[in-house]
């Protein structure tokens, strides 16, 4: 008897809970049961969207916090306006996921009995078999799994659980939001890898402390905080190697600090290859004008003390 070749096909399944959680848990279940030769892949098809909103200091609607997160970024447009970039991802099919499998009763039983999955499109529950995607849609899905969109104006990011499509004019080849940066090449104080990431954050932090300590000797003892987030700043939250200073209460302002302000989102220039985003928390005027900048190193938020010449505003590429 001639053996019939079993060809895997893509199916669509509705889910009742968070889609990526179902995908992740189902993949783990399939592997644990040894069915990964029948249920070959599970994915969510998503679209990444960008919402841009401009806030003005003069309008009084500036949010209390300008902190960057994984999906929210803040940028300075000018001395009065800030740009909030919110990145979101949504399921293109609503509450549906894609499942690639070689149909069998056992594989089908695993799928339909899995928590969070309410069935497969085409199956009525009365003995009707699920309906696979037509060949054209299946081919498109396979192409996207290779990181290639069927739409030339789109880019594709493939993760362990999802296929994420996004506008090519908003995201670069690495699927990072497109920004226009100023580039400078100050003295290197940290080793970086090919991606520009710090190799040893402890070494980096130590280098910063040593660099700032050497410069601190040149400071006057009457260095003052000329502008801060609050009228009073607790010295214990600042960097311990800032030296002696006095806290100036009220909204004292010095105009000659290269137009930097507390709350500005800036780029910290460390080497010719690495640029870290941070937020100004306080400004100082002394022998050398400096700023206290909050940056994130791995998962830890730190305050670092840097000369203003090592900072620059982040410029956003404007569309005309």
UniProtKB/Swiss-Prot annotation:
Keywords for the protein's UniProt record, in alphabetical order: Transcription, Transcription antitermination, Transcription regulation, Transcription termination
Membrane-spanning residues: none
GO cellular component, one term: cytosol
Pfam families according to UniProt: NusG (PF02357)
Coiled coil start-end: none
Top-level division of the source organism's lineage: Bacteria
Family, per entry: Belongs to the NusG family.
Classification via NCBIfam families: NusG_myco (TIGR01956)
HAMAP family: NusG
Database matches in PANTHER family: RHO-INTERACTING TRANSCRIPTION TERMINATION FACTOR NUSG (PTHR30265), TRANSCRIPTION TERMINATION_ANTITERMINATION PROTEIN NUSG (PTHR30265:SF2)
Protein name in UniProt: Transcription termination/antitermination protein NusG
Biological source species: Mycoplasma pneumoniae (strain ATCC 29342 / M129 / Subtype 1)
């Amino acid at each position: 008897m001639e053996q019939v070749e079993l060809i895997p096909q893509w199916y669509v399944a509705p889910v009742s809970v968070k889609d990526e959680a179902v995908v992740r848990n189902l993949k783990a279940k399939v592997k644990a049961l040894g069915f990964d030769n029948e249920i070959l892949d599970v994915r969510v098809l998503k679209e990444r969207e960008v919402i841009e909103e401009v806030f003005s200091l003069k309008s009084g609607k500036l949010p209390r916090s300008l902190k960057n997160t994984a999906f929210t970024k803040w940028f300075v447009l000018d001395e009065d306006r800030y740009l909030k970039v919110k990145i979101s991802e949504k399921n293109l099919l609503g509450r549906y996921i894609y499942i690639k499998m070689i149909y069998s009763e056992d594989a089908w039983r695993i799928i339909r009995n899995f928590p969070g999955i309410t069935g497969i499109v085409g199956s009525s529950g009365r003995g009707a078999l699920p309906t696979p995607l037509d060949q054209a849609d299946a081919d498109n899905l396979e192409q996207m799994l290779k990181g290639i969109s069927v739409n030339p104006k789109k880019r594709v990011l493939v993760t362990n659980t999802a296929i994420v499509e996004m506008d090519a004019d908003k995201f670069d080849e690495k699927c990072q939001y497109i920004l226009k940066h100023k580039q400078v090449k100050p003295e290197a104080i940290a080793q970086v890898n090919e991606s520009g990431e710090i190799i040893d954050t402890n070494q980096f932090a130590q280098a910063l402390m040593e660099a700032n300590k050497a410069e601190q000797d040149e400071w006057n003892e009457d260095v003052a905080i000329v502008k801060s987030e609050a009228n009073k700043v607790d010295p214990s939250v600042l960097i311990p190697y800032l030296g002696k200073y006095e806290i100036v209460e009220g909204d004292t302002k010095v105009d000659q600090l290269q137009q930097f302000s507390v709350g500005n989102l800036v780029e910290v220039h460390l080497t010719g290859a690495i640029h870290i985003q941070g937020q100004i928390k306080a400004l100082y005027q002394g022998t050398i004008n400096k700023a206290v900048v909050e940056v994130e190193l791995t998962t830890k938020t730190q305050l670092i003390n840097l000369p203003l010449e090592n900072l620059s505003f982040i410029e956003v590429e404007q569309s005309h």
